[in-house]
């Protein structure tokens, strides 16, 4: 981000997204084979769904709340209407107004290429539940007691903070540590690192662009040359990164 700008971010993302998708799918597949004594991905997925079907519902389950007039609240807000209604607002913002989505699209060599890139990125988003959400549900199922309840006694010690609260963010590291073969752990860890680095690089580059174009050039130096703006952009990246390092520990949890 500092020296290569958007071009460097784009090319590193190409490599990182391949590692992220392959590593995530591999981790999920291996975890599914261990979640049931029968083994197998399909059997594991069926076991997870049958054990905690409520974890596969967004906000409401069918039949969970019945309104006074006898209607199933699942078909009203919040429920399925969220998927066909409210979520479009959030997604219109993300794909149409998010700065680092826009800058990548505008950097395409043509309108057609930009449209293809957005469509492909949207397709990759559909894989996220498989490589992010599902491993968490698998870890949850593996730590239930015999009655199907998550308790401090049934949970692996790696999921308990010193204050006694559950460390939900430890699901992926726990799966990697306990179930991923030694030769594959490196790839999975690289996938997790790729997810962090990819997002960080994009956000830093976006921060640099916004500050340089919308603040520095617009209000402080309207006649700034391209070379000057590149320098300011690089300084902005470094400063933003230092600020992030300082405040990140305060945002834990």
Give residue spans per PLM region:
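Membrane-embedded helix-loop-helix hairpins and adjacent transmembrane boundary segments
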Residues: 1-253
């Amino acid at each position: 981000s500092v020296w290569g700008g958007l071009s460097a971010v784009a090319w590193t993302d190409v490599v990182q997204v391949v590692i992220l998708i392959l590593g995530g799918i591999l981790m999920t597949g291996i975890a599914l084979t261990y979640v049931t004594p029968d083994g197998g991905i399909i059997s594991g997925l069926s076991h997870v769904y049958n054990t905690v079907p409520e974890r596969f519902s967004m906000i409401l389950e069918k039949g969970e709340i019945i309104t006074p007039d006898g209607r199933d609240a699942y078909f009203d807000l919040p429920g399925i209407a969220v998927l066909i209604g409210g979520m479009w607002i959030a997604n219109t913002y993300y794909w149409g107004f998010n700065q680092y989505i826009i800058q990548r699209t505008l950097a395409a060599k043509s309108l057609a290429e930009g449209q293809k890139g957005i469509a492909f990125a949207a397709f990759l988003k559909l894989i996220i539940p498989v490589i992010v959400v599902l491993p968490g549900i698998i870890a949850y199922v593996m730590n239930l007691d015999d009655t199907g309840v998550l308790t401090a006694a049934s949970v692996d010690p790696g999921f308990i903070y010193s204050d006694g609260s559950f460390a939900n963010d430890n699901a992926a590291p726990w799966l990697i540590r306990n179930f991923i073969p030694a030769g594959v752990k490196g790839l999975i860890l690289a996938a997790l690192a790729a997810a962090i680095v990819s997002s960080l690089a994009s956000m830093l580059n976006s921060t640099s662009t916004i500050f340089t174009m919308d603040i520095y050039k617009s209000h402080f130096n309207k006649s700034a040359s391209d070379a000057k703006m590149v320098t300011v952009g690089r300084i902005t990246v470094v400063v933003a990164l230092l600020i992030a390092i300082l405040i990140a520990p305060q945002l834990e949890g």
